[in-house]
């Protein structure tokens, strides 16, 4: 009887995990889209961007990055999400294999151009504007734009989630990077050593804001991703922290 109950519990947990993955895009099958590229052969033009990550090399994202069209960007909530992409249905320009990229920027619409002739990022199109180096791993440079298939995949990161504290007193702006698992953060809370947990508001990209006075307190952070999973990093910033510093917390597993 005990083994039977444990077996049923295991099946239930497996089904729940499968349901969560399906709801948030994992194992949901391949979706058709298009891809172009930008940023130059060294991807220098991809630095910065609407997600606020700044230097993508120093942040660990490198050149495996993409700017997302309006339909995918979700007003910045998709920043940090990972996608597997492969070129399809174009034997003249496609290369074999697939790439995995992180969403780091926004590809704005160009309503002056038709959706199929320059307005690739116009709603409701699903479009990836890739860094040039990663584009050339699935298609030839001369192609310019190619049909692709994509799917959401978990993000694999080295080390823990990183929290960079910017701003000033009463305006704490925390950039959250290097997030594994779902990758796209939908909620952040902060707790000082003399305060309770306080929900932060998303300022832009993956910059999260708190208007409370947190100076002189050890800081803990609670991060919730789009799949509903939460990870808590306790007291990762000492009471002596200062603006401009980066601290590493726990990671999604």
Curated annotation (Swiss-Prot):
Organism from which the protein derives: Arabidopsis thaliana (Mouse-ear cress)
GO-annotated cellular components: extracellular region; membrane
Residue intervals of the Expansin-like EG45 domain: 48-160
Topology versus the membrane: Peripheral membrane protein
Protein name: Expansin-A15
Limits of the Expansin-like CBD domain: 170-249
Pfam families, alphabetized: DPBB_1 (PF03330), Expansin_C (PF01357)
Gene this protein is translated from: EXPA15
Membrane is among the record's keywords: yes
Sequence similarity: Belongs to the expansin family. Expansin A subfamily.
Database matches in CDD domains: DPBB_EXPA_N (cd22274)
SMART domains referenced in this protein's UniProt entry, alphabetically: DPBB_1 (SM00837)
